[in-house]
Swiss-Prot record:
Cytoplasmic side: 1-8
GO terms classed as biological process: ganglioside biosynthetic process via lactosylceramide; protein glycosylation
Tissue: Found in all tissues tested. High expression found in brain, liver, kidney, colon, heart and lung.
Class of the enzyme per the UniProt entry, highest EC level: transferase
Transmembrane stretches, start-end: 9-28
Protein name: CMP-N-acetylneuraminate-beta-1,4-galactoside alpha-2,3-sialyltransferase
Biological role stated in the UniProt entry: Catalyzes the formation of the NeuAc-alpha-2,3-Gal-beta-1,4-GlcNAc-, NeuAc-alpha-2,3-Gal-beta-1,3-GlcNAc- and NeuAc-alpha-2,3-Gal-beta-1,3-GalNAc- sequences found in terminal carbohydrate groups of glycoproteins and glycolipids. The highest activity is toward Gal-beta-1,3-GlcNAc and the lowest toward Gal-beta-1,3-GalNAc.
Lumenal topology ranges: 29-374
Cell compartment(s), UniProt: Golgi apparatus, Golgi stack membrane; Secreted
Organism: Rattus norvegicus
EC nos: 2.4.3.6
Length: 374
């Protein structure tokens, strides 16, 4: 009799466990599906701030884009002289063509990073799941989570993201690039020797371990070093760098990485993974793949930087963006001889989708393309 009671109780406990497990799994799948639905369904015309009778694409962008300012924005910015920074311009223009646009997240992770549900529930590159201890250890040493005080105090910020594209060569855009308040550079793209075309100023350099400059003398003074974490090893690498520990070449990197970054901890930041997630699934519409890194669903660092700038800058420009796949022998980057055809070998990026996204922004004057490569 005692055995029967034990078996009955065991079965009841097992059933309860299965029911709770099913409910938890269902809730998780529903949470994930909000991303998949937004990328696979035509949005209703009266949802998310959209205007009735206006046509939008499957992501929520206006179908008919032009370079004319909406009437209310034309009035708002009518008295600004040419070249003057227009407060709120980029976000206002973005909202006009993409009503779902919002600015809920800080540029960089801070000591409250655990409260952000959007990144807490995804593994890198789309979130921080499993990285709490590493991030906490890094932030306990860096202790700085914002731009510099001088930049934070600006009433209006003009930002430019300098891409690495060969389209920058011989454009002589250096002085125009240096006129911006914030100059964002990507990975190991050099400045020295290319100042005439790419400028000499660097405010932020965003990179990941394999993309970081390996020679300490290449790093610019007075710039912030920003990690974009695409895998858990990237956060581990940054901890090594911050604590000045030895970096092992066998720590899961796909090429050699920098073993030293000549920056003090307060000059180091961690890019909020929200912007990788937002660029991939909300703005570009890349495959969701259950929130995991997969074929063709990782945005390039350039598109991620644009997404970040739309959130943190009043005006946004780009230079050195654009891959012309019809000219396979053109230089891929302004600083080396690798040809355009090499980009086709990438399995993580969807260049065509990104081009469509960036063209929308340029056509609607959300961003300015100085080198006309998009």
């Amino acid at each position: 009799m005692g055995l029967l009671v034990f078996v009955r109780n065991l079965l009841l406990a097992l059933c309860l466990f299965l029911v709770l497990g099913f409910l938890y799994y269902s809730a998780w799948k529903l949470h994930l599906l909000q991303w998949e639905d937004s990328n696979s369904l035509i949005l209703s015309l009266d949802s998310a701030g959209q205007t009735l009778g206006t046509e939008y694409d499957r992501l929520g962008f206006l179908l008919k884009l032009d370079s004319k300012l909406p009437a209310e924005l034309a009035t708002k910015y009518a008295n600004f002289s040419e070249g003057a920074c227009k407060p709120g311009y980029a976000s206002a223009m973005m909202t006009a063509i993409f009503p779902r646009f919002s600015k809920p997240a800080p540029m960089f992770l801070d000591d409250s990073f655990r409260k952000w549900a959007r990144i807490r529930e995804f593994v890198p590159p789309f979130g921080i799941k499993g990285q709490d201890n590493l991030i906490k250890a890094i932030l306990s040493v860096t202790k700085e989570y914002r731009l510099t005080p001088a930049l934070d105090s600006l009433h209006c910020r003009r930002c430019i993201i300098v891409g690495n594209g060969g389209v920058l060569a011989n454009k002589s855009l250096g002085s125009r690039i240096d006129d911006y308040d914030i100059v964002i550079r990507l990975n190991s793209a050099p400045v020295k020797g290319f100042e005439k075309d790419v400028g000499s100023k660097t405010t932020l350099r965003i990179t990941y371990p394999e993309g970081a400059m390996q020679r300490p003398e290449q790093y610019e003074r007075d710039s912030l070093f920003v990690l974009a974490g695409f895998k858990w090893q990237d956060f581990k690498w940054l901890k090594y760098i911050v604590y000045k520990e030895r970096v092992s070449a066998s720590d899961g990197f796909w090429k050699s990485v920098a073993t030293r970054v000549p920056k003090e901890p307060p000059e180091i930041r961690i890019l909020n993974p929200y912007f990788i997630q937002e660029a991939a699934f909300t703005l570009i519409g890349l495959p969701f793949n259950n929130g995991l890194m997969g074929r063709g669903n990782i945005p390039t660092l350039g598109s991620v930087a644009v997404t970040m700038a739309l959130d943190g800058c009043d005006e946004v420009a780009v230079a050195g963006f654009g891959y012309d796949m019809n000219t396979p022998n053109a230089p891929l980057h302004y600083y080396e001889t690798v040809r355009m055809a090499a980009i086709k070998e990438s399995w993580t990026h969807n260049i065509q989708r990104e081009k469509e996204f960036l063209r929308k922004l340029v056509k609607a004057r959300v961003i300015t393309d100085l080198s006309s490569g998009i």
